[in-house]
Amino acid sequence: MSDQQTCVIDNGSGVVKAGFAGEDAPRAVFPSIVGRPKNVSALIGVDSASEYLGDEAQQKRGVLKIFYPIEHGIVKDWDDMEKIWNHTFYVELRVQPDEHPILLTEAPLNPKTNREKMTQIMFETFNVPALYVAIQAVLSLYSAGRTTGIVCDAGDGVTHTVPIYEGFSIPHAVSRIQLAGRDLTTFLAKLLTERGYNFTSSAELEIVRDIKEKLCFVALDYESALKQSHDSSQFEKNYELPDGKVITIGSERFRCPEYLFKPLEMNGRELDSIQDLTYKSIQECDVDVRRDLYQNIILSGGTTMYEGIGERLLKEIENRAPKSINVKVIASPDRRFAVWRGGSTLTSLSTFASMWITKEDYDENGASIVHRKCI
């Protein structure tokens, strides 16, 4: 199998990252969405397919109803998921899946039935020669060059904190909150409404997402930043809308991601903050490994891309950790693709060859083989 290039596919709630093992970055990055016309006549004479996938669905989203097959990190609609994989292989990567070993990623605590369903679809629908399913956070840790640490992985649909010791996640200490990128986009839209800008349709929320990604940052000291924003215009930035109109945003730039640190105060949600989530996960682990975890807090995923987030998380964790411990937060510049890169690295190792689930393994044991070979 060594002569067949491995396809690495990281399926996120919001974005699919796909490419080939051994490369530094994914070849294809596209929205994890399926779009169907709201009413068929709206698209007649344009290009009336019954459904659109990825970037094309994104471009036409004004006239489409958008479906996300992955919700909060977990596949909920297998028919649409199969379409996304089909699109990944044949359109984005332009490969025949039966000619390539496939590495798929999964959320921590992915239900057993889901792991089996992924395995079944890959071998039976796509006829792949070999498969491996890896936990996203473990791959992020590998991409940071470590085998022990705690990964705070915040994507579009869910945020996880996953303690990992010597390459294995510690399942009982994994924590998750349903607060991630999509929630921050909606929250920013709410904040902009207070300024008199209304963004409500799905196409308009895409604009808000772009504003969020380009202009938002995390304040090291929120109260101080808020006071400064009242006293001066230093945080104000302009943003040009697609129609050429220019809007100004100020304190919203740091009030939006503050939601991660103060979910109750900012938006009335009784959830753990990302600092409490991280601290709780570490405290759930054996006392002997805690120091190693505090010294290797790895940020991963698109929702950790805000400027200032690493410094703020460090400050918050230092306030909670034992004073004798030197806390360290690692925020690599390309952490948006950390999971994918970890998969690319892992499958390139010569020692990985024995880890694949082969077609023979599947034929002999069925889908449950995934629980034995992909721990």
Swiss-Prot record:
Domain of life: Eukaryota
Keyword terms: ATP-binding, Cytoplasm, Cytoskeleton, Hydrolase, Nucleotide-binding
GO cellular component labels: cytoplasm; cytoskeleton
InterPro entries, per the entry: Actin (IPR004000), Actin/actin-like_CS (IPR020902), Actin_CS (IPR004001), ATPase_NBD (IPR043129)
Catalytic activity: ATP + H2O = ADP + phosphate + H(+)
Pfam families reported in the protein's UniProt record: Actin (PF00022)
Subcellular location: Cytoplasm, Cytoskeleton
Principal EC category: hydrolase
SUPFAM superfamilies, alphabetized: Actin-like ATPase domain
EC number, as in UniProt: 3.6.4.-
Gene Ontology molecular functions: ATP binding; hydrolase activity
Family: Belongs to the actin family.
Protein function: Actins are highly conserved proteins that are involved in various types of cell motility and are ubiquitously expressed in all eukaryotic cells.
Name of this protein: Actin, cytoplasmic
Organism name: Oxytricha trifallax (Sterkiella histriomuscorum)
Organismal lineage: Eukaryota, Sar, Alveolata, Ciliophora, Intramacronucleata
